[in-house]
Regions:
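Glycine-rich phosphate-binding loops of nucleotide-dependent enzymes
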Residues: 2-182
Length: 182
């Protein structure tokens, strides 16, 4: 087993008229906090988007827990326990906090012994417990359009934790926060 949880080796990504990443190699050990710093347009978000399966590298290889992977989509990345909080949140504004977090992994109960339905009572309870466990205070029944941006960021973080992401990617984590919230 590799000592690295993430390895991106010789990654190159080109877009028409621009090279976003040119022969980039990073290695991250389990439990390590890794920060990628650079000016606007330096390719940081592109590199992290490749790790989350939103883009494929033109050249290079990605290894997760020592195994070479081809991340074909964010769903594939999620199955490998990779989560990402994007600079521009991916939330459904007319859904509740709990609905946004559990979407795609909803707890189900049987009605009349055989009809599966989403168990929102359990979802709300699970999200309340998760938010308390990690000190990310949210009310699971609040609607996204009614909450502020810093709470939306907490929702995105809770979404990763609910999915049991082991590799957490934060793209521009302080961009939407006020100085008091940082």
């Amino acid at each position: 087993m590799s000592e690295y949880i993430v390895e991106m080796k010789h990654i190159t990504k080109r877009f028409p008229g621009i090279v976003a990443n040119d022969d980039v190699t990073i290695q991250i050990k389990k439990g390590e906090i890794f920060a990628l710093l650079g000016e606007n347009g330096a390719g940081k978000s592109t590199l992290m988007s490749m790790l989350f399966g939103m883009y494929e590298p033109d050249e290079g290889e990605i290894y997760i827990r020592g195994e070479k992977v081809k991340l074909e989509s964010p769903n594939h990345a999620t199955k490998l326990n990779i989560g990402m909080v994007h600079q521009h949140f991916k939330l459904v504004s007319n859904y509740t906090i709990a609905e946004n977090i559990v979407m795609g992994m909803e707890p189900v109960k049987k009605v009349l012994g055989c009809i599966p339905v989403v168990d929102m009572k359990k979802a709300n309870q699970d999200i309340r417990e998760l938010s308390e466990k990690y000190g990310l205070a949210v009310n699971p029944t609040d609607v996204i359009s009614d909450i502020n941006v810093s709470t939306q960021q907490r929702v995105e973080i809770l979404k990763m934790l609910y999915r049991e992401a082991e590799i957490l990617i934060f793209d521009e984590p302080t961009a939407v926060l006020t100085p008091q919230e940082i």
